Structures are given as structure tokens and as C-alpha cells.
Amino acid sequence: MSIVMYLLAVLMMVIVDQAVKYWAVTMLASIGTIPLIPGVLSLTYLENRVAAFSILENQIWLFVALAVVILCGIVYALKTDKIQAPIGKISLLVIAAGAIGNVIDRVVNHYVVDMIQLEFIRFPIFNIADIYVCVGVALFAFYYLFIHKDAEEADK
């Protein structure tokens, strides 16, 4: 896949994330909560000024710097073909899209717009970019633990 295709894939994911957040700001904020599956899933507007577990409140530039470092690492890995398997490349693109989506919020709004609430467990409200990061990290862990190791052994 070419660098242009990588950029288009990330751009599409960021557009989806930002479109959902725009809807949340313009529509959901005035409503508050919309139950989708009562007792299971709802949409609840939240302006999140902290990271996971309420740490690093209002540390916008620390989050931005961390995201830039991660994005530089992803660009390096993709540009130098350090990651060969498609699942490894896809995982990095998904992580990049999530990082960019949340950085846009932090820089523009000084908070991240969250809206997805799982009601059946005690869990923080999250957004599409958070899903991208979690899914991307899970895919990368799978790649690293099972595929990367096999490819390395095959090269020996």
C-alpha cells in the first residue's frame, strides 16, 4: 500500500471520528443522554479534560507531544517497511487515526468530546477515536506476539 493510501485511510477514520464528535457537540450536548439499549448502551455527552483514570488533568500539550512522538514512530515504521504484515500496518494506521482524532479535540477545544457509555459495567465514557486506539493496540499486540515472531523465525 502506498503512502497516499495510508494517508487516505487515516483521513477517512479521522473524518468519521470528527463527524460523530460534531454531532455530539451540536445535537447530543443539549439532550444529554440518549438510551440506545436501555441498561446496556447509551450516548451521553461529556467534555473530557483528563486522561484515563482522571490523571493529568488539563495537560493538553503533554498529550499533544506524546501523540506526535507516537505518530512519528508510526510514520517511521511504515516508511521504512519495518512492519511487513498487513495486520501490523493496519493496526498502526488505526492507532494513528485515534491519536489524531483526540489531538484535534485537545488542541481546538482543550477537551475531548466523549459520548459512548456502556451502562452494564462501570466504565468511562469514550469516543470513536478511543475505539480506534484500543482496537489498533489489540491488533498490534496480536501482530507482535504471533505474526512478527513467526516472520522473524522464518527469516533465520
Name these PLM-found stretches.
Residues 1-156:
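Alpha-helical transmembrane bundles and membrane-interface segments of multipass inner-membrane proteins
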